[in-house]
Amino acid sequence: MADINHDGPKADGSQMRERPSAKPLHLYNSEDAKKKVLELNQEEEDNKHEEKRKTFGRTPDGTVFIVPQTHDMVSQLLSPSQPKNLSDLAILAVLASLIFTLYICPTSARKPVFAAIFLFWRAAYNAGIGWLLEGQSKHNRLVLWAKNSHIFENPETGNNPHPTIYKLIKREMETKIPKDYKFEEAPLEYNTWLVFRRVVDLILMCDFVSYCLFAIACFNRPPESWLLFGLRWTTGIVLFIFNVFVKLDAHRVVKDFAWYCYHVLFISIVAHAAQFAFLTLVEEPHIQKIYNPPPPRRMRQNSEKFNPEDRPATAHSDATYTDTGVIYDSVRQPAPMHHIVGLQNTDFHRSIDVTVVLLCFYMFCLATVTPNTIAVRLFLFVHAFVWRLWYALGLGYILDRQSKKKNWTRHFIKHGDTKEEAWRQWKSLYHLSMTMCHASFGAAVWKMYELPSDWFLGLTLLRHVLGAGLLLLQLWTSTSIYDSLGEFGWFCGDFFFDPPSSNLTYSGIYRFLNNPERVLGLAGVWGLALITWNPPIFYLAATAHILNLAFLQFVERPHMQRLYGRKLRAESGVSKTLRQAMPSPVRNWQSAADDYVNSTVEFIEDLLEHARPKLAAGYETIVKDTTALFKTYPARISITRVPQDLAGLDPKQYKLEIEGTPSAPTVEIQKHGGREGELARTPATRTSEFKTLTFEYGAPIRVRWQAPVNHHKKDWIGLYMVTDNQSREVTRISSNGRWVATNKGVYDSTRAEDGILVSDRLVSVNSDEDEGGDCYTGEVEFRGDKLWWTTGVFEFRYHHGGKHHVMALSQAFEIRIARFDEDDVEVDANGTVHRAVEQALLPVIQNCFDRDPEIAPSTPEESFGSLVERDGKFAKRVVFAVHQMFGIEFAPEVVQADGNARNLAWRICNAKKILAPYSMSASRGRNTPTSR
């Protein structure tokens, strides 16, 4: 971003020590700006009273500025002490029109009218604002729009085509922020945010007011007892006050009903679902991107010699080891190679998965086929109760002994197995127990549930709605826990291995709650109890909850304290926020109550510790379900008709030339493998200098373009498979993000400019094919997500004016991966091809990791970057390449688990040796395995 004040101070050493004035301070880079902001904010906190303190912020380009004080939207609109501007009056007018609509609307039409109005504003909030924020998060779209439209530039420069709008926005913003703010000097990003905020204020206020008006429209007085009436109104008012608190404190919308009406309830559920989708699809990915970036690459010491003990541990390691490699420390977290949890990880080649599916099928048959008699109900109740006891007490006892004496691991080592085998067997046992615990409970619920004859009798419908909501809450909680902990934490891995880090990271749901499974983890159990409304099911739910609390208190909590000590967080994020909002007397009373409860718990712990030899007690662990995967949405360019502004443009003046990393010579040789007829076995004779272009898989490709001087600034170049387009004049398929603009600053997306190297360089053209004159040339680079990660024949297409009319085609080129031929490489000192596999694999892995120095290894023993574990696309690229090169298919988790090229090369050699007896080639092994 260009400097806002060109005459301002320059970023030298002295400037870093000076305090900036109200004008922004332009530093060289973001890191210098970050240090400067921390320094200035700390100085303000140390030397000034709270009312006189100023807050300093920074922009991505390194601009440091004073962040003016702003107020929440309710105070801005309704507080008489806050200055009002035209936008405030407009928002108040819209709110008044909503109230007036309720007044004049007929009673019979109020419900549908205000339901539609509320759903409109809710869609504007979750879909509209969500779309804007997603574009800003991924493509910086709002800031680019402001920059390209020049809407915030001073009209005196002659660049602003809308001086009236500029003056209006300037007056609005400076009226609203009278102190520490000047519109002309504020960074572009801050001014863009201020305008965006006014739009958000309008939508949020209309969303809230229209909801309240809809609730008023649905107001009624059902026939009920005064006790139920008072309880209902008290609960509703408390929830409403809490909603206002959350709205003012955190600017979020949490709405619940204060009147007994299913219309309000159902529309509240729709609103909550929309809000949840907004948080999941828009807010959470942005939070992870900004505040939880991948940690720096794990570095290891290089060594020249590698011991056999360092090889990756597998079930076949002792029998089939062929070479050496550096792997993980045996005392640390094991490599997660084949996950168990979730339907997407079900593998019927694994005995535990077959066992779980068969047992679940038996439970389904037991619940649906057997007669609904008292004896069958009693059997299913006892069956579910026994599984719950085993799941809580049995597994709890095993974990307690493992925590204190490592009994589980010692048992397997005693019989000649490894700690990795003990871990695998524990995961299978835990997974089976958890599944059967839930399946047996579900079977009991199915047998004891009776379909209501009248859904509107009493609380029947409400019970079913709340029960379904609690089920969804548990599913979401389990998914969030699994996303935060992974399978290592899901299966209590820190009971069996030292944790990867001595520091706890509170991410995902743990940012808000210390132990979400304490209450939310069993929400679905209570939901089913509400739906069935049966005493035995309530008894099972209460038993499950008590055992769960006991497990957390007496098994998990002591173990976590032994591992992390004082690093455990004493207060969750939600508790801290609510505590700060309470009055001082209430906070003091809560502290005293907490001390009393803690002392009581310690007394009970001591009592149980002395009685432990007599108690074989263990307790329940976390309840979770399948995990959900975030989807990314590639950019799309719509297919439109041929534009009308092509007159005067000659396609012959457009040209594309490509340059990439050529594939290995063996690729051309492997095309002719003796499979052809006799005449086709010799290389074809060429009558021209034309050569087939074959590039490496995943290597960046540069495209040099030429266009006339009057070419459209929104021209763009896309990458396509040759077979995907029938027409050579118009492209009729979307690029799916594989495109680069020819010029900067014409698209409201940073992704469009990613890859531009040179734009509109004026050159003279004098050749036999082109008439004399000038033209523009440029150069773009396709790499990473803008490439096709498969093999095939491709081409680049130059398109006109943001549309899909083709002006030029590049030469078609092929992406191929050379097969690794063991007969053409030299063996190492140990008589293996491990080193040759490493050398062949390393450049392929570097290409698969976008040649990014933060994640791509420079040597075979260097670890992959942390982003490889977070984003599965990198491992999938490597898996595809390995399959093409060596004919061996791995799961992506194997690449993530191995962690470097040397381990992966060892695994490839090991797999080839294991599979050699099954090869149909005589040179690779026997056709049928034989015993000696």
From Swiss-Prot:
Give the E.C. number(s): 2.1.1.17
| GO MF annotations in UniProt | phosphatidylethanolamine N-methyltransferase activity
**How does the record say this protein sits in the membrane?**
Multi-pass membrane protein
Biological process (GO), any one: phosphatidylcholine biosynthetic process
Q: Which residues lie on this side of the membrane: Cytoplasmic?
A: 110-112, 220-225, 283-355, 399-428, 476-518
Family, similarity comment? Belongs to the class VI-like SAM-binding methyltransferase superfamily. CHO2 family.
Write down what this protein is called.
Answer: Phosphatidylethanolamine N-methyltransferase
- Please give the organism: Phaeosphaeria nodorum (strain SN15 / ATCC MYA-4574 / FGSC 10173) (Glume blotch fungus)
Q: Which gene encodes it?
A: CHO2
